Amino acid sequence: MNMLNKDILQFVTFCIGRVSQRLNLSPNKVYQKLRDSGILYDYIVPSYDVLHTFSSRYLTDDIVDYMKEKGVVS
């Protein structure tokens, strides 16, 4: 796992929790899907500065939509 500062780690944890609630999947399963698809380290972590300014609903919609675009979820 890449080294993440505390703020980014808390943000990633928040994102995983919100997406897991939306998709009715366990947080562990969401983490695996985000990690394995590259969304976690190629999108969420590098885009932290912008993404953390979004509302939780918009952020969750954005991540779920991106997961759908990449075929991670249907």
Question: Which stretches of residues belong to each language-model region?
Answer:
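Long, compositionally biased
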Residues: 48-74
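A short, structure-level motif marking secondary-structure boundaries and short turns
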Residues: 1-2, 15-16, 57-59
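Amphipathic alpha-helical interaction segments
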Residues: 23-26, 41, 70, 74
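Amphipathic, hydrophobic secondary-structure cores in small proteins
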Residues: 26-53
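Membrane-proximal intrinsically disordered regions of secretory-pathway and membrane-system proteins
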Residues: 1-4, 72-74
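Short polybasic/polar patches that bind polyanions
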Residues: 21, 35, 68
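N-terminal acidic leader/helix
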Residues: 4-29
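A generic structural signal for ordered alpha-helices
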Residues: 1, 8-12, 37, 41, ...
